[in-house]
Amino acid sequence: MKILLIDEMHPSIVKMLEKENHEVTYSPQITREEILQIIPDYHGLIIRSKTPMDRELLDRAKNLKFIGRAGAGLDQIDLDYLVTRGIKLFHAAKGNRDAVGEHAVGMLLALMNQLPKGDREVRKGIWDREGNRGHELAGKTVGIMGYGNMGKAFAKRLQGFGVKILAYDKYKRGFGDKYVKEVSWNKLKQEADVLSIHVPLTSETRGFFTIEEL
């Protein structure tokens, strides 16, 4: 099977595929135009998120059997058209959940304590003690919209901060436990001091989080 890798990957994946007698082309710097020219010759495609897998590209991939996504996000892939074409999709849904959970906590702490603003000002010789006072997380209510792998990872890391955690997921029920309370979307909006959004960008979620909605 001929497999094309179009993004930076760990070198071990090439050796692993070649060991299984696949013909591998590793081209992390390839452009979209170049992909369109050569993709008809390939049976497999391994990607990250640089190049959209849209109908134009997929129509050129006449012999494509599968796409392997090295990561969790699928917003750059036309999932419906993959089904129509019968192209299989593999992705690492849990691959970066710990990193995302930690990153989300770091961003929350930075925002609550005005660290980005304070950092910029101190670098300019400005010391605004009162203007940059932060807010403790303890006692606050954190709302999580979307309780998949990333939402759960974030909730797990919040448990030591003395916060109340509420979560809403349109497609899941019965996930509440002693740390996380499952609530409706309206209740989440009404009670949360902080809202953390953990849903993919899809036709359903694009443009959903407006000021009016929140």
Functional labels for PLM-detected ranges:
Residues 5, 142-144:
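Hydrophobic Val/Ile/Leu positions in short beta-strands of Rossmann-like dinucleotide-binding domains
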Residues 150:
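Hydrophobic/small residue at the entry helix of a nucleotide-binding pocket
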